[in-house]
Amino acid sequence: MSNEIHLGTAAFGCSVDALHGARLSSLRIAGRERLVGFTRGAAATSWGAYPMVPYAGRVRDGRFSHEGTTYQLPLNLGEHAIHGTVFDAPWSIIDRSSTHTTLATSLGRRWPFAANVTHEVTVDTVERVVTCILTVSASSATMPAQVGWHPWFLRPAKLEIDFAEMYVRDEHHIPNGHRTVPSAGPWDDCFVGARRDPRVVFSDDVRVTIESDCDHWVIYDMPQHALCVEPQSGPPDGFTLAPHIVTPETPLRRTMSLIAR
């Protein structure tokens, strides 16, 4: 069985890579690729559209506290931990068809709690929508958790965004908890209060609107070759700034839809 699952058609669809973090490895719209693809030697954080679980963005010093205990995560970005424990892990394929797949994995040894995550991806070739659903479940104990997605959209393209506020970040690109009026780009910043759904407009006038029930968005447009629009269930360093607690009875579930027009 192939590790790459192709959904939809050549004109509109996506591919999901089970070996590399259950990420979208391809997004095809009007027959053209819209995501940065894999190249030999590329960092696992630098291509496709990958799930970020159980944290999104940086965790300061890779350290957080929960119920009176301090935990240390493995560091994978200098002095900090970033983007979770499963974006570079192999996932199991639970089911697959020509338009839908479900993948699952545990959060692994790099996470101090027993927990699992599923990623469902569905393609609607008529409405031209790719829908992704992440669900993270604690196995026994309570734990903090975040989910999100990190799409790398290929340039040439431009962003259309409108947010009420952005977090103030420090020299480590980590929010300090304060918010301010959004500044002009370029950005590597977390925004809240979306007044409209973010949109990526490609040079051939294809428009991809990103809809999500996540209430935080990281916008990263500093690279020359790509734009990143990242829906997240909380801010970077969210275990400290805005912890969301998951229990065996209350999993965390969020959705992202990529809508092409």
Please identify what each model-predicted range represents:
Residues 1-71, 75, 196-212, 250-261:
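Beta-strand-rich N-terminal accessory domains
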Residues 16-18, 105-153:
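Acidic, contiguous internal or C-terminal segments within carbohydrate-active enzymes
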Residues 43-50, 74-77, 101-105, 181-185:
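Short Pro/Gly-enriched beta-strand edge/turn motifs at strand-loop
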Residues 62-65, 133, 150-152, 226-232, ...:
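Active-site scaffold segments
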Residues 65-69, 94-100, 122-129, 157, ...:
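A short, structured loop/turn motif at beta-sheet edges
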Residues 69, 75-125:
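Extended, loop-rich substrate-binding clefts of extracytoplasmic carbohydrate-active enzymes
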Residues 141-146, 151-213:
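Active-site/ligand-binding surface loops and adjacent short beta/alpha elements
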Residues 206-261:
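Active-site pocket scaffolds in enzymes
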